[in-house]
Regions:
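Pyridoxal 5′-phosphate
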Residues: 1-170
Length: 170
């Protein structure tokens, strides 16, 4: 099959006790195809591998729940969802604690600072916070309320409905 996705039945025979890491994209920037990250994660972890997900293309279209996916690491960039050019990385605490950090000896060993190689880009972090505030505003404008997670769900629902309406015209 040429689905341009990672097919579970084709991946499974490739996983074994020598597999250390499965790195996959959540969505393709070329085809728009979306991988079943939750199923692929379970399969890889069942073989003893860690899972890294590149969600750059997906994060602008759908809300991500890393706990539901079960992945060990996930990365995206806010520039894909109206924010600044900044890398955002999620990692399970036990995985992050087990990784060696390449840093100066005087730098903190505490998470998340142990992976910072210099002064944080405060202006980019402020831009990211502005993006998140925009999402909350958008949710409120479309009649959504609730806690922060519910506001993000509402914002993504509104953006998805708008994308769908635009796509219908194609």
């Amino acid at each position: 099959r040429d689905t341009w996705r990672v097919e579970p039945e084709l991946l499974e025979p490739l996983l074994n006790d020598r597999t250390r890491l499965l790195a996959l994209n959540y969505a393709s920037n070329l085809t728009g195809g979306v991988n079943d990250v939750k199923a692929l994660t379970a399969m890889a972890q069942g073989a003893g591998a860690m899972v890294y997900v590149d969600a750059v293309q997906y994060a602008s279209h759908r809300l991500i729940d890393v706990k539901d996916l079960g992945c060990d690491f996930l990365a995206c960039s806010p520039y894909k969802f109206y924010g600044p050019h900044l890398g955002v990385v999620y990692g399970k605490r036990e995985r992050l604690e087990s990784l060696r950090a390449y840093k100066l000896r005087c730098a903190s060993n505490d998470l998340p600072f142990r992976f910072s190689l210099g002064t944080p880009a405060f202006e980019l972090i402020a831009g990211l916070m502005g993006t998140l505030e925009y999402f909350q505003w958008l949710a409120a404008e479309t009649g959504c309320g609730g806690d922060r997670r519910q506001l993000f769900e509402g914002a993504y629902a509104a953006m998805g409905a708008h994308e769908d309406a635009l796509s219908e015209q194609l």
